[in-house]
A protein has these predicted regions:
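Glycine-rich oxoanion-binding loops at beta->alpha junctions
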Residues: 66, 70-83, 279-293, 316-352, ...
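Active-site phosphate/pyrophosphate-binding segments
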Residues: 154, 264-302, 371, 382, ...
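Acidic/histidine-rich
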Residues: 156-190, 467-493, 528, 535
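Glycine-rich phosphate-binding loops that contact phosphosugars or nucleotide phosphates
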Residues: 293-430, 435-444, 526-569, 588
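Generic C-terminus detector
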Residues: 257, 547, 560-562, 572-613
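Conserved short alpha-helical segments that host acidic/polar catalytic motifs at enzyme active sites
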Residues: 1-250, 254, 269-300, 338, ...
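Glycine-rich, anion-gripping cofactor-binding loops and their flanking helix/strand elements
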Residues: 183-208, 334-368, 506-542, 572-586, ...
């Protein structure tokens, strides 16, 4: 993986492709490359490093053509270097291919091809695929390039989103998908292909989302989508991209992450818009209305996700069990799909994914559906694979999230789970005034977020005082333990400081051995029933000279006296506190990363959307 862009039309493809790659940088990558048809030959350039390095290559060795493909790579097979960068060419130099995904049986295929005399130049699984297409194409003079691609894909075990061109058919692009997303942009006598919609925005709003097992042949004039295996031609309707150029640009902010932290004063409200019913103390979630009887009769609920979305799921567990009194199990999708989970028709699986393309989460959905469970999706990207695969779902409407470290998508997911828990709870007899109290607090969130953003100078001061430490510990209790986990993850992701999140009471069972006068310990300390216990934990840290940073919505005299720093959020409902307190943790991680000179929006080794298993 990580980013694909293709173009065919009347324009020079180079500016389109390079601009598309820049739009895909947020996904994370280690190299970039471009290939196009120039004078009926493949011209290509690729380079380890940034898209700007590739741009310099293009400036030094200009290439031009109306049909081309480009790629940003995040290494899975083979180290990040010029040779392993995409696009990959076959040994004739007539076929170029870019690929997201993993070819699981590439070693077996490679041995077959070596026996046929194929010489490999890279260490990647992708080169195996382009060489296989080449052998099948040139061994049979009667076969078309499209059918050679089809034939090659019959051999492949694994996941792929591929886009390929051939000098023998110079006005054609072939693309196919199995487990890795591809979006087809439909313009006026031109087409675009991309791994997500962001490179297409500004060129056309009309798109078609390819499904697994589909292949598309593009010329300047038309497109034909068919099934890879049966060759059945498919008629698919156009969808409209629901994002604007402004949403995917930084504007006045130095980094996307900071922009998206500030976006939360509006994005959380957008998530709730039209969904809160204060009079009845409930929520309106049209996307799941038809399956409410199944939800109400569920014997168990699984929440499955990865990374930040998993932390949102842990918060959702507390909320659903509190309001609906239904047992909830939260599982990493990568673990859930490989174990013998108890699933029957009375089971509900909720899959959470910002992109809607997370490979392990999608696989967990498919497994649960096969076993008879009702599946629900909580996604940000409209038309994504998980949104289409699940039986029903709720969009977060947080707007595009470009920074690799999730911010506004996380708070949107928690907001959705809060509304879902309340909706189920009210149907099952939760008192109306209890729902009204929660909704009143949700209605104040935009003001609360603004208050937090206004306190960012003090957060900068805390970051400055702690920037040279090597380790952080984040502690919370109950519903705020997942907040501690998320705070630690944010810090690790973008500042490269080692951090761990722990239940506060578990500190005594190991982590307390690490605490000294160089260890900042962040306490999530709301004024709820756990507050006296949190104070006791803080005293244990102070006794060992730890640096205490407390996040609270009501600092009392004792908390202030025990804490080196107190970061305050506005007083709010205990089930809204995880939303507001997480924003302070996002700002703290951001300021520490800035002071340490880290790459904020594209942290090392990370990808925004993990579309491989």
């Amino acid at each position: 993986m990580c980013g694909i862009i293709g173009y065919i039309g009347d324009r020079d493809s180079v500016p389109v492709l390079l601009k598309g790659l820049r739009r895909l940088e947020y996904r994370g990558y280690d190299s970039a490359g471009i290939a196009l048809l120039q004078d009926n030959k493949i011209a290509h350039l690729k380079k380890a490093g940034k898209v700007s390095d590739l741009q310099s290559l293009v400036d030094d060795s200009p290439i031009k053509g109306n049909c081309g493909i480009a790629h940003t790579r995040w290494a899975t097979h083979g180290e990040p270097n010029d040779i392993n960068a995409h696009p990959h060419l076959d040994q004739t130099g007539n076929i170029a291919l870019v690929h997201n995904g993993i070819i699981e049986n590439f070693n077996t295929l490679k041995e077959v091809l070596i026996d046929k005399g194929v010489l490999f130049t890279s260490d990647t699984d992708t080169e195996v695929l382009v060489q296989l297409i080449s052998v099948l194409y040139y061994e049979d003079e009667t076969i078309s390039f499209e059918d050679a691609v089809r034939a090659a894909l019959q051999w492949v075990v694994g996941a792929y989103g591929i886009v390929t061109i051939c000098a023998d058919e110079p006005d054609t692009i072939i693309a196919a998908r199995m487990g890795s997303p591809l979006v087809l942009g439909v313009g006026d006598n031109e087409y675009f292909l991309a791994s997500d919609a962001s490179p297409i925005v500004g060129h056309t709003r009309n798109v078609i989302y390819l499904d697994d097992g589909e292949i598309v042949k593009l010329t300047r004039e038309n497109h034909v989508i068919s099934n890879i295996f049966s060759k059945e031609v498919l008629i698919k309707t156009l969808s409209e991209i629901n994002m604007s150029i402004e949403e995917i640009e930084k504007g006045e902010f130095p980094h996307y992450m900071l922009k998206e932290i500030h976006d939360q004063k509006h994005s959380i409200t957008n998530t709730m818009r039209g969904r809160l019913n204060l009079d009845d103390g409930t929520t309106n979630l049209g996307g799941i209305e038809d399956c409410m009887p199944n939800l109400l009769s569920a014997s168990r609920i699984y929440i499955t996700a990865c990374g930040t979305s998993w932390h949102a799921g842990l918060i959702g567990k507390h909320l659903i069990e509190s309001y609906a009194q239904v047992p909830v199990h939260v599982e990493y999708a990568s673990e859930f799909r490989y174990r013998n989970a108890i699933i029957d028709p009375n089971t509900v699986l909720i899959a959470i994914s910002q992109s809607g393309e997370t490979a392990d989460t999608l696989a967990a959905v498919i497994k649960a559906k096969e076993m008879g469970a009702l599946t629900l999706g909580i996604c940000n990207v409209v038309g994504s694979s998980i949104a289409r695969e699940t039986d029903a779902g709720i969009y977060t409407h947080a707007g595009p999230e470009i920074g690799v470290a999730s911010t506004k998508a996380f708070t949107a997911q928690v907001t959705i789970l809060t509304m879902l828990a309340l909706k189920i709870g009210r149907k099952m007899g939760v008192a109306k005034d209890r729902g009204q109290n929660l909704i009143s607090a949700l209605n104040r969130v935009d003001d609360d977020v603004q208050t937090i953003l206004d306190s960012s100078n003090f957060i900068k001061a805390v970051a400055k005082d702690t920037m040279h430490t090597d380790n952080f510990l984040y502690l919370g209790r109950g519903i705020n333990f997942p907040v501690a986990l998320e705070g630690a993850l944010k810090l690790k992701e973008i500042s490269y400081i080692h951090a761990e999140g722990y239940p506060a009471a578990e500190m005594k069972h190991g982590p307390i051995a690490l605490i000294d006068d160089n260890m900042p310990v962040v306490f999530i300390a709301p004024q709820d029933e756990t507050f006296p216990k949190i104070l006791a934990n803080i005293q244990e840290v102070k006794a060992r000279k730890g640096i205490v940073i407390s996040i609270t919505d009501k600092p009392n005299r004792e908390l202030k006296s025990l804490s080196d720093y107190v970061l305050e959020v506005p007083r709010t409902h205990q089930h809204v506190f995880p939303i507001t307190s997480s924003i302070i943790l996002q700002l703290l991680a951001y300021e520490l990363a800035v002071l340490r000179g880290c790459e904020i929006d594209q942290p090392r080794n990370l990808a925004k959307s993990v579309t491989v298993e």
